[in-house]
Swiss-Prot record:
Entry's Gene Ontology BP terms: queuosine biosynthetic process
EC number(s) reported in the record: 6.3.4.20
Lineage start: Bacteria, Pseudomonadati, Pseudomonadota, Betaproteobacteria, Neisseriales
Name of this chain's protein: 7-cyano-7-deazaguanine synthase
GO terms of molecular function: ATP binding; ligase activity, forming carbon-nitrogen bonds; zinc ion binding
Organism for this UniProt entry: Chromobacterium violaceum (strain ATCC 12472 / DSM 30191 / JCM 1249 / CCUG 213 / NBRC 12614 / NCIMB 9131 / NCTC 9757 / MK)
Catalytic activity: 7-carboxy-7-deazaguanine + NH4(+) + ATP = 7-cyano-7-deazaguanine + ADP + phosphate + H2O + H(+)
Coiled-coil boundaries: none
């Protein structure tokens, strides 16, 4: 069995609101010097998030590694990796999966992350997936993650543990958690917009959910404030 440290953690950092919050949660949970980040370049439409992830990792003072996975772009069929498909606007009110669903993405990401953590002697994997609010992505559900954790433990003969701090939090509760763990400054550099726009487009489902969460939490969005200040030359 791999003798991984009970203290080391690897965070899957996309550069978005949720993964940024989880990075700072991990720093509180495991301590500075015990946390690394891994980011996946999978041919995503919103390429700006890769730059955001680098900036946020630097702000947090954690080592970051970017791993390329070009398979999803080759498969296509969804709005995040296929340039011919525009992301749907607004939040769906039915049970159908949105066209931003990338089949198998989180399963692949976490499998690669587990392999990477194995080589680093880290036992803990932290991811920002959540099954509340919107999307209904099947690879964000707790039962999926629990099953994957079992498979990773068996397949790598390790004691890997998946942490999902946001699993049952609403977007407003996620904002509150970000406050508690000191992530608000870093969230000014995070990226959520499916269209890859800065300032955020404001009308894709991801932008709408982010805005709703900050509004319900009664907290100004640091990203919006930064963009407004830059537009005013401040």
């Amino acid at each position: 069995m791999n003798q991984a440290s009970d203290e080391k953690a690897l965070v899957v950092l996309s550069g978005g609101q949720d993964s940024t919050t989880c990075l700072y949660w991990a720093l509180r949970r495991f301590g500075a010097g015990k946390v690394e980040a891994v980011t996946f370049d999978y041919g995503q439409r919103h390429r700006v998030e890769l730059d955001c992830a680098r900036k946020i990792a630097a702000l947090a003072g954690v080592r970051q590694t970017v791993l390329p996975i070009d398979t999803f772009a080759a498969i296509g069929g969804n709005a995040l990796t296929d340039a011919s498909i525009a992301p749907e606007e607004g939040v769906r009110d039915d049970d159908a999966l949105p066209n931003t669903f990338v089949p198998g993405r989180n399963l692949v990401f976490l499998t690669f992350a587990a392999a990477f953590a194995y080589t680093r002697g880290a036992r803990h994997l932290v991811t920002g997936v959540a099954q509340t609010d919107y999307s209904g992505y099947p690879d964000c559900r707790e039962n999926t993650l629990k099953a994957l954790e079992v498979a990773l433990r068996l397949g790598m003969d390790s004691r890997v543990e998946l942490h999902t701090p946001l699993m049952y939090l609403s977007k407003a509760e996620t904002v509150t958690l970000a406050q508690q763990v000191g992530a608000l400054e870093a969230l000014a550099w995070s990226h959520t917009c499916y269209n890859g726009e800065v300032p955020p487009c404001g009308h894709c489902a991801s932008c709408e959910l982010r805005a709703k969460g900050f509004a319900e939490a009664g907290v100004p969005d640091p990203l919006v404030e930064r963009c407004q200040a830059e537009a005013q030359g401040l």
